Design a protein with these regions (language model features):
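N-terminal Rossmann NAD(P)H-binding glycine-rich loop of SDR-like oxidoreductase domains
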Residues: 5-25
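NAD(P)H-binding glycine-rich loop region in Rossmannoid oxidoreductase-like domains
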Residues: 37-38, 43, 47-91, 101, ...
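Short-chain dehydrogenase/reductase
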Residues: 86-90, 122-133, 154, 158, ...
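Conserved beta-loop-beta element that borders a ligand/cofactor-binding pocket
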Residues: 134-156
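Substrate-positioning beta->alpha
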Residues: 159-163, 177-200, 206-210, 220-223
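Alpha-helical membrane-targeting segments
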Residues: 163-188, 235-278
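Mid/C-terminal beta-alpha module of Rossmann-like enzyme folds, strongest
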Residues: 201-265, 296-306, 312-315
Length: 315
């Protein structure tokens, strides 16, 4: 009998790549899709689509009914205030956990969180990701669960980091923060492979794991700029932008977004995240418990990302 898995965020960046990876396994896939995103559904991958969202308890019950595993990829990455993030990243997690916990037998629950949860004081986003993790631990009961905390995820289809890579392809790298800041990255296909490895292993339940691409000590902005220059065959010039100037712009952007009812990406909280000196992850525990080893180097990941977005290097 085929095992079944429920996925949220399946039409998004990470969820879409995970669907493609699971399509080559024996998992039978059921996925949640918002009615407004029905046109984004990939064909011949998902066995059943459940129309609904994280605020609709009935659709969540249908999503998880009788499944062996739940992978929660959906989440809010932008918002005008804490309540906007918590509605999805905290309350949505709690509802899905309660729906899954009510199943017999109970499925294994995988929450795709973020390394940002390590520093909840920095932003509303980071705080909501930490609270979402706490909501899982608080409401899971005897249901087995795992939290994955990937570092910054990039790859073809990513709309958050691609604008930065496009600027670098044009020869300009706008940089804020200290030259001493270090951060880890993770190619999206390596993240999907880690989830599949964990589905096979069943180890380390009831804990969280950090993840990155295996580059010890992370990267500096100079490392990223040099990698883009190698891949693109073009010199990239770094332009240092003063943090107070960026913070001022972020403050005005947030105020304008609130007036217009938009969900902004650039906010004072996001600036604090970007200028935090240490976003270096640690793969040790995850590799020990699952055998997962990231395969995609930074140069190869950038090459694949920019190849899929040829306009990035033409404009």
């Amino acid at each position: 009998m085929r095992r079944s898995i429920a996925i949220t965020g399946a039409t998004g960046f990470v969820g879409g790549v995970l669907l493609k990876r699971l399509a080559s396994t024996d998992w039978q896939i059921r996925a949640l899709v918002r009615p407004a995103s029905m046109h984004k559904r990939p064909s011949q991958v998902v066995s059943e689509w459940v129309a609904g969202d994280l605020e609709d308890m009935e659709s969540l019950r249908r999503l998880v009914a009788g499944v062996d595993a739940v992978v929660h990829c959906a989440g809010a990455v932008r918002g005008a205030g804490l309540v906007n993030f918590e509605r999805i990243n905290v309350d949505g997690v709690a509802r899905l956990v309660l729906a899954a916990r009510a199943q017999h037998p109970k499925p294994r629950f995988f929450l795709i969180s973020s390394l940002a949860a390590r520093e909840p004081h920095l932003s509303h986003y980071a705080a909501s990701k930490r609270k979402g993790e706490e909501a899982l631990a608080l409401n899971a009961g005897s249901m087995p669960w795992v939290i994955l905390r990937p570092s910054a995820v990039y790859g073809p289809g990513d709309l958050e980091l691609l604008p930065l890579f496009r600027w670098m392809c044009r020869g300009i790298a706008p940089v804020i923060g200290s030259a001493k800041s270090r951060f880890s990255l993770l190619y999206v296909e390596d993240l999907a492979e880690a989830i599949v490895c964990y589905l096979k292993s069943g180890m380390g339940l009831g804990r969280s794991y950090e993840m990155h691409d295996g580059h010890a000590g992370g990267y500096s902005w100079g490392d990223i700029i040099d990698a883009v220059a190698r891949v693109n065959g073009r010199t990239v010039y770094q332009i240092k932008i003063p943090v107070p100037l960026v913070m001022l712009g972020a403050t005005f952007n947030l105020a304008a977004a609130r007036m217009c009812g938009r969900a902004p990406m650039l906010t004072p909280g996001k600036v604090r995240e970007l200028t935090h000196p240490n976003w270096v992850g640690d793969n040790t525990a995850l590799t020990r418990d699952t055998g997962w080893i990231p395969q995609v180097t930074l140069d190869e990941g950038l090459r694949q990302t920019l190849r899929q977005d040829r306009a990035a290097c033409r404009k």
